A protein has these predicted regions:
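A short alpha-helix capping/helix-coil boundary motif
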Residues: 19-22, 59-62, 104-108, 137-140, ...
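Active-site-proximal loop/turn and secondary-structure-junction residues that shape catalytic pockets
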Residues: 9-11, 27-29, 57-61, 103-105, ...
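Histidine-acidic metal/acid-base catalytic patches
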Residues: 1-19, 74-75, 92-94, 151-173, ...
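Catalytic-core regions built around general acid/base machinery
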Residues: 37-48, 120-131, 187-190, 218-223
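Active-site acidic/histidine proton-transfer and metal-coordination neighborhood
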Residues: 47, 66-170
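Short secondary-structure transition/capping segments
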Residues: 35-38, 65-67, 109-111, 151-153, ...
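N-terminal pre-domain/capping segments
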Residues: 1-93, 125, 166, 193, ...
Length: 257
């Protein structure tokens, strides 16, 4: 499996020095920066030959899912996907954009849950149609019930994914949220070929270290059992600092890499 990390582009040298294969960007940030800063990002990526295979932060903070028009979604995705795929366009094909955004998809009080699901499914289809043009696949991220009230488990994400019924709409498993919701590993088997991406952290949301070897081996085995060929991104608390967290991750990296 290829290993990446949700990381600040200014520190990509730290990933490159440790054998990482890619970095995971923030899509909303990437879409919102100036052309000048985007060129700086491109220069750093080229310097270290490390590019964003994936992006999280699909929606910006001001984008409320149940208030957006299809045109707004199309325009946003066109800009965001265009920028993402310009980075390393000659080096990699087929990017992943993680659809998390607990606040963006939070169902407002009194709002119909059935209607919320209809809007979410349609929004996924609209974004995925833009994704077709850029070879970008959406990965629905379940978020634990303390962070949102909609799509908390991988089982729920799979249900939504199947309703969207689009080749560029798939699912992600984030093992922190998976752990929080006490989902059984058998759900990974249920996901099968619909699993497009993985976020990895320890059960306490820190970057995994030697103390997490046993649980990380179990998660890796579950992925192997379905023939998972996708990538894995580190996403968690980089404490006490990025360098120390990366060094502590080395033994776990050997499990997945």
């Amino acid at each position: 499996m290829k290993i990446g990390a949700c990381f600040n582009y200014k520190n990509l040298h730290l990933l490159k020095e440790r054998g990482f294969d890619f970095w995971e960007a923030n899509l909303g940030w990437l879409a919102g920066i100036s052309d000048e800063e985007f060129e700086k990002v491109r220069e750093v990526c080229d310097r270290y030959d490390l590019y964003p295979y994936s992006a999280n932060g699909f929606f910006t903070a001001d984008m409320k899912l149940y208030e957006m028009t299809e045109r707004r979604l199309q325009e946003y995705c066109t800009l965001a996907f265009s920028r993402l795929t310009q980075l390393g366009h000659n080096r990699m094909r087929g990017r992943i954009c993680v659809v998390g955004g607990g606040g963006n998809r939070m169902i407002p009080p009194g709002f119909s849950r059935v209607r919320a699901e209809e809007i979410f499914v349609n929004s996924l289809r609209v974004c995925a149609e833009v994704g077709l043009k850029y070879d970008v696949t959406l990965a629905i991220e379940p978020l634990n019930s303390k962070e949102t009230n909609f799509v908390n488990t991988l089982s729920e994400a799979l249900k939504v994914c199947k309703k969207a019924d689009h080749p560029h709409v798939m699912c992600l498993v984030d093992f922190y949220h998976f752990y929080c919701e006490n989902e059984p590993l058998d759900v990974i088997k249920e996901a099968g070929e619909l699993l497009a991406h993985v976020h990895l952290s320890a059960p306490d949301r820190y970057i995994p270290s030697a103390k997490d070897m046993d649980v990380c081996r179990k998660w890796k085995k579950a992925l192997e059992n379905i023939g998972y060929k996708g990538c894995v991104s580190l996403e968690g608390y980089w404490l006490p600092d990025e360098v120390t967290a990366l060094e502590n991750f080395r033994p776990v990296m050997q499990i997945y890499h």
